[in-house]
């Protein structure tokens, strides 16, 4: 999606100008995950035909932009986008309007929101619309509703997700796996508050350079902020007592809930929210430890993505360099950048460069992952930071008794756990690996006469911490099998009189695979192994065939 966004934004700007020529009053343009949007101030609705008449009617050679606003014929249209710039080299000619809706920013105003895409060639547009049709079939928002995983409610607030029991089960499994990864690298888990005085953000630089994302409020004369990042809090834990060179590296991890004020037009299911949980980690170490630490992080990151079934060709690291707005000296930035380059080269991974896309406090390695629909998602990040230790005056006592500054490394492998859930749901089309599935086995008794045996099978699995449930014979067997398949259940156990008398089950798995006369204890043994190893494939049924 990222590669399309510059041409989409240019298309949105062109269409906004043309709408002005038609007498409409657009107030903002921006980008969503899969399209552009234009907000038009209007007391009445705008039809698709009216929008189509404005497309390509007038294309200015030079778009008049001042202070991130389109300025045209006395109108000012805000550009709600800070990562993608307007390119003079792009010339979108082929548009598709995807949706027109209305919303009310306040009780007295109505905006019409136009969503669409634009491309330079007709072939690009056709290819994208074909892809979009496939993607909509696996939209995580539809899967989430169908499987009863999560929901959003206007009463709760835009971009604030509520995870239901089955959705929370998936999150818990992801967190448990990452805890094991963290333990293998020597992390100590911490917990920090959701709210801090803004003094901490002023020291870190977030207050100035991240101000539009901060949620702040005043209480008893002090200004507080809901945390957008966990790093300053971890820094304070480091500062809570003296440290020596023998203590380093110190590795803190936290599944920390953070909040960022994303623009309403940018919100998109779990992929773009205002509150989410990061699998965050911060390492405090000596300079001589830096290269090996980064190499270990790169290796572990690749190991994690392999566990989810992504191949080497699906994993692409990028070095993101110093942005225009940043803190720290040229010398510190060069030192941090060289450390990342050295570790990447020694890892043997081919990597790309993303100019000026580093964090404001340091360069970083970003990992992009390709899903089953061919989309690339930016997930993992490793950031080297010499600047925040300087700002917070962090110290350790070196072996010669001299106080020195530690280096800080920020890292997250999933990135946002909530966003990763969305990506997995779409990647696996709702059919998650058994270890991640909220319901791993569903038992189907053929008749009520075998309910007692079915319940014994159910309880034996639950005793072994397998997430199992039973669907009694209220509907036909074929209907119940279809329901289980539609709800993404990996294994179905069918039990009748024969199975009850022999202590067996009939096992059905994805792909219409059926294995009869399976000893229940054998199935249970294989399933426990599959779940314990976190296999992506259904290895239990493969072993039974």
UniProtKB/Swiss-Prot annotation:
GO cellular component assignments: cytoplasm
Any one GO molecular-function label of the UniProt entry: threonine-tRNA ligase activity
Pfam family membership, one: HGTP_anticodon
Originating gene: thrS-cat
EC number(s) recorded for this UniProt protein: 6.1.1.3
Cofactor notes: Binds 1 zinc ion per subunit.
NCBIfam families, per database record: thrS
One BP term from GO: threonyl-tRNA aminoacylation
Primary location group: cytoplasm
Source species, domain of life: Archaea
Region annotated Catalytic, chain positions: 139-433
Protein name, as recorded: Threonine--tRNA ligase catalytic subunit
Cofactor: Zn(2+)
Protein keywords: Aminoacyl-tRNA synthetase, ATP-binding, Cytoplasm, Ligase, Metal-binding, Nucleotide-binding, Protein biosynthesis, RNA-binding, tRNA-binding, Zinc
Binding sites annotated in the UniProt record for Zn(2+): 231, 282, 410
Catalysed reactions, semicolon-separated: tRNA(Thr) + L-threonine + ATP = L-threonyl-tRNA(Thr) + AMP + diphosphate + H(+)
SUPFAM superfamilies in the cross-refs: Class II aaRS ABD-related (SSF52954), Class II aaRS and biotin synthetases (SSF55681), ThrRS/AlaRS common domain (SSF55186)
Subunit-structure text: Homodimer. Probably interacts with its editing subunit.
Family matches, as CDD domains: ThrRS_anticodon (cd00860), ThrRS_core (cd00771)
Function noted in UniProt: Catalyzes the attachment of threonine to tRNA(Thr) in a two-step reaction: L-threonine is first activated by ATP to form Thr-AMP and then transferred to the acceptor end of tRNA(Thr). Also activates L-serine and transfers it to tRNA(Thr) but cannot deacylate incorrectly charged amino acid; unlike most archaea the editing function is found in a freestanding protein.
Family recorded in the similarity comment: Belongs to the class-II aminoacyl-tRNA synthetase family.
Cell location: Cytoplasm
């Amino acid at each position: 999606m990222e590669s399309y966004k510059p041409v989409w934004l240019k298309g949105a700007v062109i269409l906004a100008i043309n709408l002005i020529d038609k007498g409409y009053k657009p107030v903002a343009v921006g980008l969503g995950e899969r399209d552009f949007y234009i907000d038009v101030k209007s007391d009445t609705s705008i039809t698709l035909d009216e929008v189509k008449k404005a497309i390509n009617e007038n294309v200015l050679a030079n778009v008049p932009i001042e202070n991130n606003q389109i300025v045209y014929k006395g109108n000012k249209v805000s550009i709600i986008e800070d990562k993608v710039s307007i390119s003079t080299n792009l010339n979108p000619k082929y548009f598709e309007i995807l949706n027109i809706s209305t919303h009310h920013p306040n009780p007295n105003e109505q905006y019409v929101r136009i969503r669409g895409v634009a491309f330079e060639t007709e072939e690009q547009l056709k290819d994208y619309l074909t892809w979009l049709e496939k993607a909509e079939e696996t939209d995580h928002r539809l899967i989430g509703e169908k499987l009863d995983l999560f929901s959003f409610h206007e009463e709760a607030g835009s971009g604030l997700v509520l995870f239901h029991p089955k959705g929370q089960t998936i999150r818990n499994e992801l967190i448990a796996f990452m805890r094991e990864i963290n333990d293998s690298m020597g992390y100590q888990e911490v917990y920090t508050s959701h709210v801090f005085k803004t003094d901490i953000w002023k020291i870190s630089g977030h207050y100035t350079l991240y101000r539009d994302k901060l949620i702040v409020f005043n209480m008893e004369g002090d200004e507080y902020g809901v945390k957008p990042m966990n790093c300053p809090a971890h820094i304070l834990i480091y500062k809570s007592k003296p440290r020596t060179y023998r203590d380093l590296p110190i590795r803190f991890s936290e599944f920390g809930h953070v909040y960022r004020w994303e623009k309403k037009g940018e919100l998109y299911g779990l992929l773009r929210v205002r509150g989410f949980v990061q699998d965050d980690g911060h390492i405090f170490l000596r300079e001589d430890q830096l290269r090996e630490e980064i190499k270990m992080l790169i290796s572990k990151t690749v190991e994690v993505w392999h566990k989810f079934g992504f191949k080497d060709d699906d994993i692409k690291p990028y070095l993101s360099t110093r942005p225009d707005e940043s803190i720290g000296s040229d010398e510190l930035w060069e030192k941090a950048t060289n450390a990342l380059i050295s570790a990447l080269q020694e890892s043997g991974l081919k990597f790309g460069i993303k100019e000026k896309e580093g964090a404001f406090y340091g360069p970083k390695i970003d990992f992009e992952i390709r899903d089953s629909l061919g989309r690339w998602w930016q997930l993992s990040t490793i950031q080297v930071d010499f600047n925040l230790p300087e700002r917070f005056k962090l110290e350790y006592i070196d072996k010669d008794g001299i106080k020195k500054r530690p280096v800080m490394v920020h890292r997250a492998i999933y990135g946002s756990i909530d966003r990763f859930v969305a990506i997995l749901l779409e990647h696996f089309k709702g059919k998650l690996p058994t270890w991640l599935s909220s319901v791993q086995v569903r038992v189907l008794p053929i008749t009520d006469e075998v309910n007692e045996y079915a319940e014994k099978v159910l309880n034996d699995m639950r005793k072994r911490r397998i997430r199992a449930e039973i669907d009694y014979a209220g509907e036909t067997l074929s209907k119940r099998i279809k329901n289980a398949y539609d709800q993404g259940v990996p294994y179905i156990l069918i039990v009748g009189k024969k199975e009850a008398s022999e202590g067996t089950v009939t096992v059905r798995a994805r792909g219409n695979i059926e294995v009869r006369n399976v000893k229940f204890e054998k199935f249970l043994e294989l399933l426990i192994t599959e779940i314990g190893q976190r296999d992506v494939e259904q290895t239990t049924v493969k072993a039974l065939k």
